[in-house]
């Protein structure tokens, strides 16, 4: 068997880099010389000194969401690979629920406008034979609803303009619940502009449901017995105490509606960017702008309105006052917001608003400069026109002066 050095000295085209790229070790077998040429077999042997570590491919995928504009749309959240098992026992909980120990239901959140008149909502719901409850005064109205044999709770959030249903499909919410309170919506959106968030939840309503989970890890069971929480992509509602369970649902509803309300502003921002992109491209190409100052002012007005809805006119950037005095509800609200990436999304939206505002200000400055240049030319033309008049008047005076007879001419005539 020949060494690598003798092989490379004979076959100059073989390099150590090429052999490394093959990922194998090469050896020469039965090498002999015939007719002045090397002949032999190259045997490939798999490397045994390299250990291939197994990679955990247990990666959580984003749940697909149906939207009227786009049949399938990813939720605005990010996932990272699960390279190790969680230590708090939540993986055990998810595995247990996947075996149909408890029924997994859908929690649908739909934002239909900027807000709801809750007093009018209660009147409309009462007219339909429902029994609304002012769960959180001036903030959330809740009522029980039944559709196609499914019974669940529905919450209307007045400040966010959102409806959160617990136990119903998206089509049921759109076709049955939203029309009931449509008249109470403030600045409603078009149907195709509704923003929707979908999550699964499990509700523990009695001791029997709790017993179904008694086989879980001891670290998880005590937590289920005392509070509601978020486990991965699954909401766990503890309704052993029905009143506390409704408050927990309200906290989850506030976090979910925060996401859909933010999604409305994100969509408005994307529409603005798509409108102004052609203008920016035309400027880069040196094309003459067919843009009026009023259009630029409307554009920057839209940006200020989006920024105001994000930072001033709503509680998107802060925790509602209600949850400050309720640590458990505050934890639920913050966990949902963290899971839906509310903080990073707000920062990204503010960055886009900053850039777009600077862009609009540059356009307004450009238009003002163009208008000032136009006015300067008008002034120049007026000065030139006035100068022509002055020259003409001077010529007339000079001509009349030259045509008048002088004293010498008068003496000569005498």
Swiss-Prot record:
GO cellular component annotations of the record: mitochondrial inner membrane
Keyword line: Membrane, Mitochondrion, Mitochondrion inner membrane, Transit peptide, Transmembrane, Transmembrane helix
Transmembrane segments: 374-394
GO terms classed as biological process: positive regulation of mitochondrial translation
Compartments it resides in: Mitochondrion inner membrane
Mitochondrial matrix side: 30-373
Membrane topology, from the record: Single-pass membrane protein
Residue span of the annotated presequence: 1-29
Pfam families: DUF155
Parts of the chain on the Mitochondrial intermembrane side: 395-414
Oligomer and partners: Associates with the mitochondrial ribosome.
Homology family: Belongs to the RMD1/sif2 family.
Function text: Component of MIOREX complexes, large expressome-like assemblies of ribosomes with factors involved in all the steps of post-transcriptional gene expression.
Protein name as it appears in the record: MIOREX complex component 10
Organism this protein belongs to: Saccharomyces cerevisiae (strain ATCC 204508 / S288c)
